[in-house]
């Protein structure tokens, strides 16, 4: 996917959750902000603690009254998180580029190729792993956002213990199994 198509796609995808929330939201007095490609909305970088890939926060929880949090995981390398469950939110995955992502949502086994997306419902255990040889890129949308943004803030710190069950519990999730790949 070329850079122009990717950027257009990201802009279109990020508009979808707002259309859903529009009827419920109060108009903001804040100016509209554009988040450039390969940048983070907060202005400082985040890392996926297990794989050290980039996590770019694109839409912050506070911008949508806790309804939506959107993060782009770019420069993905082989691996992924432990099997876990979210008590409070759905998680939508949109695989943008790279090799493949293998997933399990509940008992269903899934393979995502670039352009594919899937929704993991709340309270359904899920796990994923990137298996491409070239760096990959995937967009995650969480709704409602709950405490997920602070989870990513905390786990992107250099000394963070990613597999800490207490950290997951404190953010409305539970580890229920190992990662698909070590």
Residue positions per predicted region:
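N-terminal secretory signal peptides and thylakoid transit peptides that target proteins
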Residues: 1-17
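Ligand-binding loop in jelly-roll beta-barrel domains
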Residues: 122-149
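Short acidic-glycine-tyrosine-enriched beta hairpin
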Residues: 107-122
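A short glycine-rich, His/Asp/Glu-containing loop-to-beta-strand
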Residues: 47-83, 89-90
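Glycine- and acidic-residue-biased ligand/ion/polar-headgroup-sensing regions
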Residues: 90-101
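Acidic/histidine-enriched, glycine/proline-rich intrinsically disordered or flexible terminal extensions
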Residues: 149, 153-182
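C-terminal segment of N-terminal export signals and the immediately downstream linker at the start
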Residues: 21-55, 157
């Amino acid at each position: 996917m070329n850079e122009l198509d990717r950027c257009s796609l990201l802009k279109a995808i990020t508009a979808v959750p707002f259309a859903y929330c529009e009827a419920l939201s109060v108009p903001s007095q804040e100016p509209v902000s554009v988040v450039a490609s390969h940048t983070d909305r907060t202005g400082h970088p985040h890392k996926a603690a297990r794989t050290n890939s980039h996590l770019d926060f694109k839409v912050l929880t506070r911008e949508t009254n806790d309804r939506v949090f959107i993060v782009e995981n770019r420069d993905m390398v082989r691996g992924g998180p432990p099997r876990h469950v979210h008590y409070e939110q759905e998680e939508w995955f949109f695989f943008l580029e790279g090799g493949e992502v293998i997933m399990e949502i509940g008992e269903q086994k899934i393979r995502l190729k670039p352009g594919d997306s899937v929704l993991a419902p709340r309270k359904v255990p899920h796990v994923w792993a990137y298996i491409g040889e070239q760096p990959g890129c995937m967009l995650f949308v969480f709704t409602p956002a709950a405490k997920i943004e602070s989870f990513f803030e905390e786990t992107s710190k250099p000394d963070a213990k990613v597999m800490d069950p207490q950290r997951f519990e404190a953010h409305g999730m539970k580890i229920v199994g190992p990662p698909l790949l070590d």
